[in-house]
């Protein structure tokens, strides 16, 4: 039986990968890091501070990830974790060289769709070999009958990036490039965010990979920067949480217009360590749905918790203290590998 089986973002969770903060660092400043992550924060890539995150940040985050894993285990979920890796090691191709980033966000580089798991062609050079952290798991899933695909490795030359372009146009269409976290699963409908972490060719490649069973919906002018899971959050069939600073009547994906849309309330700014945060305050709506009536939510976001409870959701309140520093909340820091239902939904 395939150990990979996921059709959407809400069916009861059976197996999940929880990331690790061990060894996390800001990679060497290069054109990819500047264009994708920091073009709006610094005038040149030379200004970007790189190197290891403070030990305190990593220690506290790893402890909180352990708590998350333990709580999910109590709920009967099988939890898998990557082992430690040396992210300071050099990564080199004929076109460039850099060092690594982290394995904190398995959501960013692996996409599970049905019984298929896909290694996506990520936008940052520092994440070029990130899937190696999960190689043993991928082999195990493959042995169980899962379909294992790896997108063509992008060259990620300087031509792939336009750091001086407006936000949303800094990743060019030289070749298919996208992070898995640019995708949300709604049964046979896949929402694909066209942004600085996912280009048009990436959407075209994904459609060819998943075949005619699925429809990839490229969403443009929804959110310019990286990843979609703090912009639109599916809670259960027919109910979606949206970011009021990004989603409006004009850019709401057509296939979601019939859904009940609840607007995320103002969030608590949890702060960050260092000169610049890696993500905005909206990381507070980056939640993990465990089943249609239960979600893991940042305990500090009390207004959001009350809103979810009002709409019939129970909440498991946990905390990732440094989510703005490291760039990921509970959805980012996990990858759902298997959910109970075998039914696919088409809306």
UniProtKB/Swiss-Prot annotation:
Keywords: Antibiotic biosynthesis, Streptomycin biosynthesis, Transferase. Catalyzes two non-consecutive transamidination reactions. It converts scyllo-inosamine 4-phosphate into N-amidino-scyllo-inosamine 4-phosphate and N1-amidinostreptamine 6-phosphate into streptidine 6-phosphate. InterPro entries: AmidinoTrfase. Signal peptide: none annotated. The keyword Phosphoprotein does not apply. The keyword Ribosomal protein does not apply. It comes from Streptomyces griseus. Pathway: Antibiotic biosynthesis; streptomycin biosynthesis. Homodimer. GO terms for biological process: creatine biosynthetic process; streptomycin biosynthetic process. It catalyses: 1-amino-1-deoxy-scyllo-inositol 4-phosphate + L-arginine = 1-guanidino-1-deoxy-scyllo-inositol 4-phosphate + L-ornithine. It comes from the Bacteria. This is Inosamine-phosphate amidinotransferase 1. The active site is at 179, 227, 332 (amidino-cysteine intermediate). Belongs to the amidinotransferase family. PANTHER family: GLYCINE AMIDINOTRANSFERASE, MITOCHONDRIAL (PTHR10488:SF1). The lineage of its organism: Bacteria, Bacillati, Actinomycetota, Actinomycetes, Kitasatosporales. GO terms for molecular function: glycine amidinotransferase activity; scyllo-inosamine-4-phosphate amidinotransferase activity.
């Amino acid at each position: 039986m395939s150990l990979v089986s996921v059709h959407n973002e809400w069916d009861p969770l059976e197996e999940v990968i929880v990331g690790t903060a061990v060894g996390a660092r800001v990679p060497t400043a290069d054109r990819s890091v500047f264009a994708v992550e920091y073009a709006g924060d610094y005038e040149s890539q030379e200004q970007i501070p790189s190197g290891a995150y403070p030990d305190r940040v990593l220690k506290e985050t790893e402890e909180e990830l352990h708590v998350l894993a333990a709580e999910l285990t109590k709920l009967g979920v099988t939890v898998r974790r990557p082992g430690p890796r040396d992210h300071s090691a050099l990564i080199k191709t004929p076109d460039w060289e850099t060092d690594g980033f982290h394995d904190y966000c398995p959501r960013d580089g692996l996409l599970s769709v049905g019984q298929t798991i896909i290694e996506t062609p990520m936008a940052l050079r520092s994440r070029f070999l990130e899937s190696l952290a999960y190689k043993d798991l991928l082999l195990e899933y493959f042995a169980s009958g899962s379909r294992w695909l790896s997108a063509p490795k992008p060259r990620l030359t300087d031509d792939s990036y336009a750091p001086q372009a407006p936000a949303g146009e800094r990743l060019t269409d030289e070749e298919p490039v996208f992070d898995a976290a640019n995708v949300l699963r709604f049964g046979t409908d896949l929402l694909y965010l066209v942004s600085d972490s996912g280009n048009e060719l990436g959407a075209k490649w994904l459609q060819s990979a998943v075949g005619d069973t699925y429809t990839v919906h490229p969403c443009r002018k929804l959110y310019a920067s990286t990843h979609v899971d703090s912009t639109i959050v599916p809670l259960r069939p027919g109910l979606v949480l949206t970011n009021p600073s990004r989603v409006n009547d004009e850019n709401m994906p057509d296939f979601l217009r019939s859904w009940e849309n609840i607007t995320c309330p103002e969030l608590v700014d949890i702060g960050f360590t260092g000169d610049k945060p890696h993500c905005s305050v909206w990381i507070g709506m980056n939640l993990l749905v465990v089943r249609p009536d239960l979600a893991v939510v940042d305990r500090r976001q009390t207004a959001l918790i009350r809103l979810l409870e009002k709409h019939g959701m129970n909440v498991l309140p946990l905390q990732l203290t440094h989510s703005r520093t490291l760039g990921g909340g509970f959805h980012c820091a996990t990858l759902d590998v298997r959910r109970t239902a075998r039914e696919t939904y088409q809306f």
